Amino acid sequence: MTREEAIKKIIFAMDVKEFSDVQYWAELLSQHVGMFKVGKQLYTACGPAAVRMIQKCGGEVFLDLKYHDIPNTVAMATLEAANLGVQLCDLHAMGGYEMMNKTMEALDKNFSGCTPRPKVLAITVLTSSNEETLRGIGIELPVPEMVVKLAKLAKSAGVDGVVASPQEVELIREACGKDFLVVTPGVRPSFASADDQKRIMTPAEAVKAGADYLVIGRPIAAAQSPVEAAQKIVDEIVAG
């Protein structure tokens, strides 16, 4: 794998709340990561302006708002995300088949022809969760089995891929095929701590397992030199 290919796999989690920080990180890392993730805190604080600033700096955007509501509401919200020109957005697989399918139908209807639409990802089981967490909400399945069940449901609804722990990537590949996108948080380079993620791998391990994109935040943002940290992650991926 080339360095350019490795860079494109990295999604930097822009976990900030100040608009000035958006420009700072976008300008600093636009040549060193493949995409920027805008989550709930940043989007609530700054709104679409955060997305536009990243785009102005030449960056691509994963709008990580994890929609989970009645089908029509999620479909309309996803259309608005698509109209912002983001590359990735997501919804919760636990919202069910109808919610996911109606969303994909709305996107395909509104983005037919030459206009590209964003790829839509379904959230499976959050990487901060384990089997005790699932039991607490009445789910008795083991985490890997639940993840695969949700991934297969998402694929049947027409969703482009899933967000899942790197530990479940190979199982998802077996169940859903090589063309189904898998985006993995819970990735920690060899030089970083695990923080609050419970099901983790190194970048090289996750890519080897078949991950298409790696979501990485604190190991880059908290480093003394964020650019150097991003470059080290690229080195790890290339080295395999």
From Swiss-Prot:
Organism, as annotated: Geobacter sp. (strain M21)
One Pfam assignment: OMPdecase
Pathway recorded for this protein: Pyrimidine metabolism; UMP biosynthesis via de novo pathway; UMP from orotate: step 2/2
Enzyme category, top tier: lyase
Keywords: Decarboxylase, Lyase, Pyrimidine biosynthesis
Gene: pyrF
Active site location: 66 (proton donor)
Name of the protein described by the UniProt record: Orotidine 5'-phosphate decarboxylase
GO CC terms in record: cytosol
Subunit details: Homodimer.
PROSITE patterns, alphabetized: OMPDECASE
GO MF annotation, one: orotidine-5'-phosphate decarboxylase activity
Positions contributing to substrate binding: 15, 37, 64-73, 127, 188, 197, 217-218
UniProt EC number: 4.1.1.23
Function comment: Catalyzes the decarboxylation of orotidine 5'-monophosphate (OMP) to uridine 5'-monophosphate (UMP).
